[in-house]
Swiss-Prot record:
Gene: Chid1
Record-stated family: Belongs to the glycosyl hydrolase 18 family.
Signal peptide boundaries: 1-19
Disulfide-bond pairs as recorded: none
Oligomeric form and interacting partners: Interacts with STAB1.
Function: Saccharide- and LPS-binding protein with possible roles in pathogen sensing and endotoxin neutralization. Ligand-binding specificity relates to the length of the oligosaccharides, with preference for chitotetraose (in vitro).
Descriptive protein name: Chitinase domain-containing protein 1
Organism: Rattus norvegicus (Rat)
Highest rank taxon of the organism: Eukaryota
Record-level GO BP terms: carbohydrate metabolic process; innate immune response; negative regulation of cytokine production involved in inflammatory response
GO terms of molecular function: chitin binding; oligosaccharide binding
Subcellular location: Secreted; Lysosome
Length: 393
């Protein structure tokens, strides 16, 4: 599917790619330190000639911290924008405070829903809840809603069967969820449960989600569902959540956080989210565009580093990406088919690598696609990106 990438990967394995710095070039590069701007800019990236396909490593390093502070609260994207924040990438907490007005929902990844016995449920992770941070975000962004992710964790098949077949269990589950939202001053939840359950129980899961949504809506709370891609990556086969399920839940739920990333694997390295695949995932879910505004197209603010010799990959977040650019000064290549940038580099003893990581241009193209399709976006996650990305939102 991606001929350019297949050729590149073969070249990496064979060790014949000539874009890597020679030893003499590497010594010259090491003698110079790439500069990073630390001051804000009075212009957004769109007006600074930075949203282009032909990018250079030194320009990314120089500009990535320099966002337009004067427009940090102005929105450029009219649709819904959900941003995830995780405790393990704490920079996301600062991003939410600075750029909160660009988001309609912020989802801290704090909570787990566990079944403790018959009609007994507990939400764990409350020790991570930061009320002061929530107040600070809302102070600077009046309209933003705080909707923590709620993960169904450690549920067995028997747990699901017992709950989905019992109205009393579903009622107790809903009561527990609503009560925690009220106690903690949340605006709702992003529920992650669909991928944890085998397909034969999806009818019962739709029934449970319907009851949960009714209970949350009665308390004036939001419910957004995390859903896997509608087209299985690397195939033309339908995924676990398709138009059939979407059509039943779209009138009931407030949104769908669509996981349109992690397309490639360590065995088949390539782009994180090819543009044609993203489009197909939306069109399969809602071919008639009836509920498109509720679909939140997943945007990854992380990348992947593929090691040719080990047949392995590792996630790349902003700090590591910038350091890799500093250390190796690679030639960054635009894949026009996938609409993503990538580069290759060689470690001293670790062999050759290919890195895919979002850029201003790849993100702009996806935001334009979201506008065209009439969908919102969901970002995983705010602590992993580069600060100047937010000029685009």
């Amino acid at each position: 599917m991606w001929p350019l990438l297949h050729v590149l990967w073969l070249a990496l394995v064979c060790g014949s790619v000539h874009t890597t710095l020679s030893k003499s070039d590497a010594k010259k590069a090491a003698s110079k330190t790439l500069l990073e701007k630390t001051q804000f800019s009075d212009k957004p990236v769109q007006d600074r000639g930075l949203v282009v396909t032909d990018i250079k490593a030194e320009d990314v390093v120089l500009e990535h911290r320099s966002y337009c502070s004067a427009r940090a609260r102005e929105r450029n994207f009219a649709g819904e924008v959900l941003g995830y924040v995780t405790p393990w990438n704490s920079h996301g907490y600062d991003v939410a405070k600075v750029f909160g007005s660009k988001f309609t929902q912020i989802s801290p990844v704090w909570l787990q829903l566990k079944r403790r016995g018959r009609e007994m449920f507990e939400i764990t992770g409350l020790h991570d809840v930061d009320q002061g941070w929530m107040r600070a975000v809302k102070k600077h962004a009046k309209g933003v809603r705080i909707v923590p992710r709620l993960l169904f964790e450690d549920w067995t098949y028997d747990d699901f069967r017992s709950v989905l077949d019992s109205e009393d269990e579903i009622e107790e589950l809903s009561k527990t969820v609503v009560q925690v939202a009220k106690n903690q001053h949340f605006d709702g939840f992003v529920v992650e449960v669909w991928s944890q359950l085998l397909s034969q129980k999806h009818v019962g899961l739709i029934h449970m989600l319907t009851h949960l949504a009714e209970a949350l809506h009665q308390a004036r709370l939001l419910v957004i569902l995390v859903i896997p891609p509608a087209v299985t990556p690397g195939t033309d086969q339908l995924g676990m959540f398709t138009h059939k399920e979407f059509e039943q839940l779209a009138p009931i739920l407030d949104g769908f956080s669509l996981m349109t990333y992690d397309y490639s694997t360590s065995q088949q390295p390539g782009p994180n989210a090819p543009l044609s695949w993203i489009r197909a995932c939306v069109q399969v879910l809602d071919p008639k565009s009836q509920w498109r505004s509720k679909i939140l197209l997943g945007l990854n603010f992380y990348g992947m580093d593929y090691a040719a010799s080990k047949d392995a990959r590792e996630p790349v977040i902003g700090a590591r990406y910038i350091q890799t650019l500093k250390d190796h000064r690679p030639r960054v290549v635009w894949d026009s088919q996938a609409a993503e940038h990538f580069f290759e580099y060689k470690k001293n003893r670790g062999g050759r690598h290919v890195v895919f990581y979002p850029t201003l241009k790849s993100l702009q193209v996806r935001l334009e696609l979201a506008r065209e399709l009439g969908v919102g976006v969901s970002i995983w996650e705010l602590g992993q990106g580069l600060d100047y990305f937010y000029d685009l939102l």
